[in-house]
Swiss-Prot record:
SUPFAM superfamilies: 4Fe-4S ferredoxins. Keywords: 4Fe-4S, Iron, Iron-sulfur, Metal-binding. This is Uncharacterized protein MJ1681. InterPro entries: 4Fe4S_Fe-S-bd, Fe-S_Ferredoxin, HcyBio, Methan_mark_16. GO terms for molecular function: 4 iron, 4 sulfur cluster binding; metal ion binding. It comes from the Archaea. Residues 287-318 form the 4Fe-4S ferredoxin-type domain.
Length: 380
C-alpha cells in the first residue's frame, strides 16, 4: 500500500522555523511552495479556426492584438497556428474566463474574422520562457528625472522603489539545484493548471535560476493570471506552485525572508547601490489595501481608479469596491485623501511605492496544490 504523504504549505513550514520547531520538519514529506509576479516571458500558442478557407495567413490578431503566424502554414484550411506574447495579460485573462474574443486573419489582402472562445481553440497552450525567477531585485531612480518603466505603474521618481519576488515562498529559493536536470520533467501548477517544467528558462544560471514551463490554458483559473499596466506598457502576471520533497531540499527550506538578499539597483545601468533583504518588504506589511470610505470625496476623476494597474478599483453608487483582480501592488496609496492605505515597507531606507509580486495569490495556489496532492489529483 502506498504511503500517505504528509503535505504542508510553504508558509506552514516557515512558521516551524520561526517558532524554533525545526524537529517537526522531519514529519513532513512534501512542501508546496509558490510565487506570483510579473513574468514578461509568457506566450500563448493557439490553433485558431475561421469559418472561411484561405491560402495562408500573413497576419493574425486577437482583439486587435497582433500575434505571430506560426510555423505550420495550414494551406487552404482556414486555420492559423499563432503565437501571442507581449501585451497579452488582459487578453489571456479574458480567454481563460471564457469570454468571446475577435480573431482576425489577413490573407492575400483580404480580412477574415471570427468570434471565438477558448473552447473553440483545439490548442491553447501557455509557454513561459522565463518564469518563477529565484527572486529578483528592487529598482530605484537616482536621477532627478522621472522615468517610464515596466517596473512601476507610474513614472519612477527619485527617492522611491519598486520590487519583485515572493521571498521565502519562492520555489527556487527553497530548492537545492545543482544542474538543469534537477528540474526537467517535474510537475507544477501554472495558474491552477497542471504544468510540466521543461528546464531552465532564458538567462538562467545555477546561481540565478528561472524556469521554462508549459500548461494548457483551458485548465487555468483566471484569478491567477492577468494584465498589469505599467508606465511603459502592459505586462502579464502568473502564479506558480511547485511541490518540494523535504528530504531532498531540507536545508534550503529553512531560509526565512531575512536570509534572502534583495539587491537595490539603479534603473539606469542596473548597478547595485545597496543590498537589503526580503524581510524589509514582506514583514509587517499589508497584502491588500485598507479602505477608509468616509474619507472619499467622490472626485470626478478618481486617481486610484485611473491608475490601478489591474483595473481592480470600481466606484458603484458612491461606494468604492475592490475586486478580486487586486494585485496588492500598493499604487492606490496615491489617493491624496488617504482613502486607501497599504503598508509596503522599504528597502535600504527607500520606500516601496509599487509591488510587482503578490503573496496572497502565491499562498492561495500553494494551498490549492496541497489539497490536490492530498486528494490524489496531483501525482508527484
Amino acid at each position: 500500500m502506498e504511503k500517505e504523504l504528509k503535505v504542508i504549505t510553504i508558509d506552514e513550514l516557515k512558521k516551524y522555523i520561526r517558532n524554533n520547531e525545526e524537529d517537526k520538519i522531519e514529519e513532513v514529506d512534501v512542501v508546496t511552495s509558490a510565487t506570483c509576479g510579473i513574468m514578461s516571458g509568457t506566450a500563448g500558442i493557439f490553433h485558431i479556426p475561421f469559418n472561411e478557407v484561405f491560402k495562408r495567413a500573413e497576419e493574425i490578431y486577437l482583439n486587435d492584438i497582433k500575434g505571430v503566424v506560426g510555423i505550420c502554414p495550414n494551406e487552404f484550411l482556414g486555420k492559423v497556428d499563432a503565437i501571442f506574447y507581449g501585451e497579452v495579460g488582459f487578453l489571456f485573462k479574458d480567454l481563460v474566463k471564457g469570454k468571446v474574443v475577435e480573431a482576425k486573419a489577413i490573407s492575400e489582402g483580404k480580412i477574415y474574422k471570427n468570434e471565438i472562445t477558448i473552447d473553440d481553440l483545439p490548442t491553447a497552450k501557455m509557454i513561459g520562457t522565463r518564469m518563477a525567477f529565484k527572486n529578483y531585485t528592487a529598482i530605484t531612480n537616482l536621477s532627478d528625472e522621472e522615468v517610464n518603466t515596466i517596473f512601476h505603474r507610474l513614472p519612477l521618481k527619485k527617492g522611491e522603489a519598486s520590487f519583485s519576488g515572493c521571498g521565502m515562498l519562492n520555489p527556487l529559493e527553497n530548492m537545492v539545484i545543482k544542474d538543469e536536470k534537477d528540474v526537467v520533467g517535474k510537475k507544477a501548477l501554472l495558474n491552477g493548471a497542471e504544468a510540466i517544467i521543461l528546464g531552465f528558462g532564458t538567462r538562467a544560471s545555477i546561481e540565478k535560476p528561472n524556469l521554462m514551463m508549459s500548461a494548457d490554458m483551458k485548465d487555468m483559473d483566471a484569478y491567477y493570471l492577468g494584465g498589469f499596466v505599467t508606465s511603459n506598457g502592459i505586462e502579464i502576471y502568473n502564479t506558480i506552485a511547485v511541490p518540494i520533497k523535504v528530504d531532498e531540499h531540507k536545508e534550503a527550506l529553512k531560509k526565512l525572508d531575512k536570509d534572502i538578499t534583495l539587491p537595490l539597483v539603479n534603473i539606469f545601468g542596473r548597478e547595485i547601490i545597496d543590498i537589503g533583504s526580503y524581510a524589509e518588504v514582506w514583514e509587517n506589511v499589508d497584502l491588500r489595501p485598507k479602505i477608509y470610505q468616509d474619507k472619499c470625496k467622490n472626485c470626478r476623476e478618481c486617481l486610484v481608479e485611473k491608475y490601478c494597474p489591474t483595473f481592480a478599483i470600481k466606484r458603484e453608487n458612491g461606494k468604492i469596491k475592490i475586486t478580486e483582480d487586486c494585485f496588492g501592488c500598493g499604487v492606490c496609496n496615491i489617493c491624496p485623501y488617504g482613502v486607501f492605505k497599504t503598508k509596503l515597507g522599504s528597502v535600504c531606507g527607500i520606500p516601496i511605492t509599487c509591488r510587482q509580486s503578490d503573496r496572497k495569490r502565491a499562498l492561495k495556489l500553494a494551498k490549492e496544490l496541497k489539497k490536490k496532492i492530498e486528494r490524489g489529483e496531483f501525482k508527484i
